[in-house]
Amino acid sequence: MTKQKKFITCDGNQAAAHISYMFSEVAAIYPITPSSTMAEYVDEWAAAGRKNIFGETVLVQEMQSEGGAAGAVHGSLQAGALTTTYTASQGLLLMIPNMYKIAGEFLPCVFHVSARTLASHALCIFGDHQDVMSARQTGLSLIHISEPTRPY
């Protein structure tokens, strides 16, 4: 007997949160629009005791800033945990110093980035790739997707 597949309707943030939850042991989060919902889903699932593919509940650490989240990612990776975080725009810029360290130490991690315009005098919230392109010199591999449900 074959098992029925379960399909759900979701947006890109939920799809990315689902796949990252399944393959992570630690998630260092700090909410920043438009990536906040990814962190919220992961936090909700961990609080409910949902198991990942390793049969464990993901340890979610909400930090005081994006820089703190990047530092927590680096420390967790150093300890050997599969770690992820979620960010956008200025938050990603604050993570760049730790991204250099992570890349230089060849540590495997995933930064889920909801690409957004860097805030200027007009505080624009439209999508572009200024934030992601500012991190391209760190040595981390960048993978871009053209539609929001591709992570799943």
Which positions does each model-derived feature cover?
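Thiamine diphosphate
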Residues: 1-135
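Acidic/polar active-site rim loop that often engages polyanionic ligands
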Residues: 135-142
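Single conserved hydrophobic/aromatic residue that forms the stacking wall/gate
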Residues: 143-152
